[in-house]
Amino acid sequence: MLTALVYVAAALAEIAGCFSFWAWLRLGKSSLWLIPGTASLLLFAWLLTLIDVSAAGRAYAAYGGVYVTVSLLWLWAMEGVWPDRWDLGGATLCLIGAAIIILAPRPA
């Protein structure tokens, strides 16, 4: 359960950080948006180090499914765009892949 919470927190931190750059470069917002955005990206990187896995790449691969799902929630909640069936189908496939990576039996 803690792993899932860390992954969701990391996804929110990464998306918020990246969105600050999007807002600055694409929406014409002040460059001051980059200050909390950069802090958010640092938080994202730190949070992924809390995942209890033997290899960083495995943590990142499993995180990918969570990131896609949280990104679609951001799309809906923050940008007012409802994900279509292709978005939802793709997210489902990503979550299945992430679950396989996270839950696979591995030697200790």
Curated annotation (Swiss-Prot):
Subcellular location: Cell inner membrane
Transmembrane segments: 5-25, 31-51, 62-82, 88-108
GO cellular component, one term: plasma membrane
InterPro entries cross-referenced by the UniProt entry: UPF0060
Superkingdom as given in the UniProt entry: Bacteria
Primary location class: membrane
Membrane topology category: Multi-pass membrane protein
Keywords, in A-Z order: Cell inner membrane, Cell membrane, Membrane, Transmembrane, Transmembrane helix
Pfam family, one: UPF0060
HAMAP family: UPF0060
The family this protein is said to belong to: Belongs to the UPF0060 family.
NCBIfam families to which the protein is assigned, alphabetical: PRK02237.1
Protein name in the entry: UPF0060 membrane protein Msil_1658
Protein's organism: Methylocella silvestris (strain DSM 15510 / CIP 108128 / LMG 27833 / NCIMB 13906 / BL2)
